[in-house]
C-alpha cells in the first residue's frame, strides 16, 4: 500500500512540536522560576508538609546538663497533584502541505496553553500570602506600599532576595508616579536570562517582574515573596504523546496530546505579602 500515514512519517514533526512547545511553556511562565520546586516523586499521592517551631539557646551552668526540647513538625498543608492537558489536531492534508508551519503552530499552541495554565495557577496564590497586605481596591500602588510589603516580609526574618510580580498596569502606575520613584537598577544576569522578557528592574533586594496572567481589575493582586512562599510539585514533566485517528478528515489526522501532572500551593504563607491595586 502506498502513501501510508505511519508514526515514522511524523516522528520528526512530533519531536519538533515538543521542542517548540517546551520552549514556549518555559519562556511564558513568569512565577515558576521564583518558587520552591519539587521533582522527587512520580506518585499521584498528595504531599503533606509541615514546619518546625520552638527551640531556644540558653546558658548552661558548669555543673548543669542540657534538657531536651520538643522537636516536632506542625502540620502545614497538602499539595495534591492533578493532570493538566491540551491537544492539537494535525490533519494529514495539513501535514503534507506545510509541515514546518504546522510544527511551529502546534508547538506554540501547546506551549502557550501549558505556560498560561501553570502561571495563572501560581499567580492566583498571591491572595493567600499572609505576611501583610498593602494597597487598596481601586487605588494605585505606591513605592511606599512596595517598601511596606518588604518590611512585612523582613519582619518574618525571611532572608534573601524577593521577587515582586505585578500586573503590567500596576507596574505602569508605579513608574509613572510624579514623585517618590527610586533610582531603579538593572540586573544584567536576570535581563539576559530566559525570564528577561518579564523583568523590569531591581531595587533594595527586590527584583520586579510583570505578569499579564494576574487577573485584571480594580483590585488586582500582585505578590512580593521569597522562594519558599509558594511550591510547585511536578510529578510528570511536560510531555507530548501522538495518537493516529484514521477516520478523521477522511484520510486521517494526528492528535498531538500534551500533558503535565503537578501540584501547587502556598508553602510558607508568612514569607510573602499581598500588593493590591487597580490594573485598569
Q: Model segments located where?
A:
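Extended, solvent-exposed, turn-rich assembly/linker loops in the middle of proteins
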Residues: 128-202
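Alpha-helical scaffold segments that mediate packing/assembly in large oligomeric complexes
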Residues: 91-160, 274-280
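Short, structured patches in soluble enzyme cores that scaffold and shape functional sites
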Residues: 92, 166-168, 260
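Short helix/loop capping segments that flank catalytic or ligand/cofactor-binding pockets
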Residues: 57-59, 98-99, 173-176, 265-267
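N-terminal "assembly arms/tails" that initiate or stabilize quaternary assembly
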Residues: 1-76
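Short acidic, glycine/tyrosine-flanked loop/strand segments centered on an H-E-D-like triad
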Residues: 74-97
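C-terminal interaction module
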Residues: 174, 192-243
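Protruding loop/beta-arch "assembly-hinge" segments enriched in small, turn-prone residues
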Residues: 1-30, 201, 226-280
